[in-house]
């Protein structure tokens, strides 16, 4: 994702160390390898998940035909036959979210451990920092695609309604083994979210903090705010931005920046928008607004609708108006 990138990180928004964070070529050191390899097994499937989601067309036509002609058995069978394999895909996406959650928790454990500061972790463990960024990048790409595809929830709702009717009528349901009732309930909650992958990561980060009570919460929140600063500085500094060899690096940095802001806002007691926040929210929003509008609308919506503290009374009117 670009060549060697020099970034300025400020753990406490004062002068911080300069170091290179290589989003493209970072290789794991011996101490990183165990976690890196575990996370890599998950990440290598990420692109295929996105391709499947991008090509997801839904069974809207077949479902409409079946609903309009309830007595026509052939149309009912055709709709069911179209929906079952699609639900198999939706199940695969959901199961991948669970794997991604486990990968994130492994990375958080490595990047927040004592005795190093978040800045030292990101500098020393660049391969893990890169994987953390890749998880966030995937998450926002997934959610952008999901938000613009209403067929997903329509297909799954039809599947559940039809399955329920078949049970009442004691009709054997081919494909029922694909998704049992408990799994279907969890999938329904997942797909009901506007940004389901981001919600999964937010919940995982909150759970990580609550389960690691011996670890200061600042270790986690400072890791997130430092990563946000890294991305913002790379994007707003022409000298750094000119080093990008690929325009895709810009969208990579934007998605990672937004992802860590949302995670920070869910984990930090007062959130990302408070005056005491270690994230320069005005600077981050300005960077987003400086991009072509159609390329960042999904990211701005993620900040508007999936953060926790944006609408708090303590959030400045200026920040609220910037996101209107």
UniProtKB/Swiss-Prot annotation:
Q: What is the membrane topology here?
A: Lipid-anchor
Question: Does the entry feature the keyword Membrane, yes or no?
Answer: yes
Expression induction or repression: Protein levels are negatively regulated by Salmonella.
Q: Name one GO molecular function term.
A: MHC class Ib protein binding, via antigen binding groove
Q: Name one Pfam family in it.
A: CYRIA-B_Rac1-bd
Alphabetical list of InterPro entries matching this protein: CYRI (IPR039789), CYRIA/CYRIB_Rac1-bd (IPR009828)
Instruction: Give an example GO cellular component term for this record.
Output: extracellular region
In which domain of life is the source organism classified? Eukaryota
Q: How is it modified after translation?
A: Ubiquitinated at Lys-74 upon Salmonella bacterial infection.
From its record, what is one biological process in GO terms?
positive regulation of T cell mediated cytotoxicity
Location, primary (coarse class) = membrane
Record location of the Glycyl lysine isopeptide (Lys-Gly) (interchain with G-Cter in ubiquitin) cross-link: 74
**Where does this protein reside within or beyond the cell?**
Membrane; Mitochondrion
What keywords are assigned to this protein?
Isopeptide bond, Lipoprotein, Membrane, Mitochondrion, Myristate, Ubl conjugation
The entry's family comment says: Belongs to the CYRI family.
Q: Quaternary structure?
A: Interacts with RAC1 (GTP-bound form preferentially).
Tell me, what does this protein do in biology?
A: Negatively regulates RAC1 signaling and RAC1-driven cytoskeletal remodeling. Regulates chemotaxis, cell migration and epithelial polarization by controlling the polarity, plasticity, duration and extent of protrusions. Limits Rac1 mediated activation of the Scar/WAVE complex, focuses protrusion signals and regulates pseudopod complexity by inhibiting Scar/WAVE-induced actin polymerization. Protects against Salmonella bacterial infection. Attenuates processes such as macropinocytosis, phagocytosis and cell migration and restrict sopE-mediated bacterial entry.
Protein name, UniProt field? CYFIP-related Rac1 interactor B
